[in-house]
């Protein structure tokens, strides 16, 4: 544990004024010409980061009653490890940085399914998401279909060719990739898009196409 990053985390839990710290893997795109070399994290190195973060988080919990240090969801997905339960994230202080987002989504989605809903007729819908979140979204849609057989949801994992590299988060998926990969494959008249794919308070993707235009082009 003599690496600088480990020593840095050790300094964090000695300072009680720090509310929370998140670790997020660097997204390596195809647009890194003339920049320093950045090797993407793989399953093994991601697991090592999780072990370090959880160890220091446990120590913070013992010292201060709060974990303070959190790995983002991406580390668990890259390492092939289960996303922690909601209790792990406490107050979700780092939710905007992708820490606990998947755990919270799963918890809220399943809680909503427990409520009674009246649904008439068959409902069809297409949903797009990033490659990282696709397994969880598919799992939740399967659970939805199990409880409500009249609802059909087709999940489309979108590979990020726009930015390339190892980018797999839903928030960086563009309309360009959605159109290219979904054209002729949509099975309904409704397209579900995660809010994180859109510009803040706007109905446009990062490449400035609107949701309605994207749906029209992809259908």
Identify the role of each PLM range.
Residues 17-22, 27-217:
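Auxiliary Fe-S-binding modules of radical SAM enzymes
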Residues 2-13, 215-218:
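Single conserved hydrophobic/aromatic residue that forms the stacking wall/gate
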């Amino acid at each position: 544990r003599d690496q600088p990053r480990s020593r840095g985390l050790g300094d964090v839990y000695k300072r009680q004024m720090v509310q929370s710290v998140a670790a997020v893997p660097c997204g390596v795109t195809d647009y890194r010409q003339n920049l320093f070399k950045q090797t993407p994290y793989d399953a093994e190195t991601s697991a090592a980061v999780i072990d370090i973060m959880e160890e220091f988080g446990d120590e913070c919990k013992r010292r201060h009653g709060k974990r303070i240090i959190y790995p983002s969801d991406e580390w668990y997905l890259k390492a092939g490890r289960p996303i922690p339960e909601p209790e792990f994230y406490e107050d979700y202080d780092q939710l905007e940085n992708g820490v606990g987002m998947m755990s919270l989504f799963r918890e809220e989605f399943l809680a909503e399914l427990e409520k009674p809903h009246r649904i008439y007729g068959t409902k069809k819908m297409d949903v797009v998401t990033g490659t990282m979140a696709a397994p969880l979204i598919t799992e939740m849609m399967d659970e939805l279909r199990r409880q409500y057989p009249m609802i059909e949801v087709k999940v489309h994992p979108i590979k990020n060719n726009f930015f390339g590299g190892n980018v797999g988060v839903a928030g960086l998926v563009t309309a360009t990739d959605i159109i290219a990969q979904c054209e002729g494959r949509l099975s309904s008249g409704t397209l579900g898009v995660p809010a994180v794919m859109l510009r803040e308070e706007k109905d446009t993707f990062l490449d400035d196409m609107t949701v309605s235009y994207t749906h029209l082009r992809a259908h």
